[in-house]
């Protein structure tokens, strides 16, 4: 991916960056819904800003630039992690790297138990790398969904690359039934367990 970016003229400009522009650009689905929501906002959408503002580290946060369909290379294969958007933001405590994953009713890809079925050496390498980036113990529970791991790792990787103080993975859900929220909570709980272990060791 070239380090050259052009301004967006509207939501339609996001379509050409999709992995499958025709199949994924559908009204009522996440890619198109997210594009219209974020293009219609001045900075962060209000509901996103309300969530970010709850974290002291994100006080007075503002986006510096937002890039649709941001790709981050990962070891273990040629497929990159492609977030719906990546934001480099600034708060009172410094730069913030944020990967954004839009959802309506779509899942977070397969749970690891399915994803690891007949896993190639490349998959094993990638999973170990993601665990190391996120500071998670091996093995990661099979119920955790793969997409949550590599999207969150992407935020951390880009934070290191751009010298950001903080990293966050944001799920912007448009689901009226909070579809897949339980799976997201399980992942957050796993991250919380890591923090508790770190505090106990200090």
What are these regions (language model features)?
Residues 87-99:
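Active-site beta-strand-loop-beta-strand hairpin of nuclease catalytic cores
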Residues 108-169:
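Acidic, metal/cofactor-coordinating or nucleic-acid-engaging core segments within structured domains
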Residues 71-72, 103-107, 174-177:
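Short, solvent-exposed loop/turn segments at secondary-structure junctions
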Residues 82-86, 102:
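Conserved beta-strand->loop/alpha-helix structural units within folded catalytic cores of enzymes
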Residues 1-77, 90-93:
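Acidic-basic catalytic patches of nuclease active cores, encompassing PD-(D/E)XK
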């Amino acid at each position: 991916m070239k380090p050259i970016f052009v301004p967006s003229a509207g939501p339609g400009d996001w379509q050409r960056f999709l992995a499958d522009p025709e199949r994924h650009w559908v009204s009522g689905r996440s890619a198109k819904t997210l594009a219209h929501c974020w293009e219609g906002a001045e900075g962060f959408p209000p509901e996103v800003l309300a969530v970010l503002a709850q974290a002291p580290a994100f006080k007075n946060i503002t986006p510096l630039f937002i890039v649709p369909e941001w790709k981050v290379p990962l070891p273990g294969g040629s497929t990159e992690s492609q977030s719906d958007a990546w934001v480099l933001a600034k708060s009172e405590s410094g730069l913030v790297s944020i990967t954004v994953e839009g959802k309506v009713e779509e899942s977070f890809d397969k749970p690891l138990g399915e994803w690891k079925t007949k896993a190639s050496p490349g998959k094993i390498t990638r999973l170990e790398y993601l665990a190391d980036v996120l500071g998670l113990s091996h093995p990661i529970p099979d119920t955790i969904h793969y997409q949550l791991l590599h999207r969150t790792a992407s935020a951390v990787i880009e934070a290191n690359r751009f010298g950001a103080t903080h990293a966050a993975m944001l799920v912007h859900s448009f689901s009226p039934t909070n579809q897949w929220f339980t799976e997201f909570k399980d992942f957050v709980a796993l991250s919380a367990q890591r923090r508790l272990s770190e505090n106990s060791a200090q």
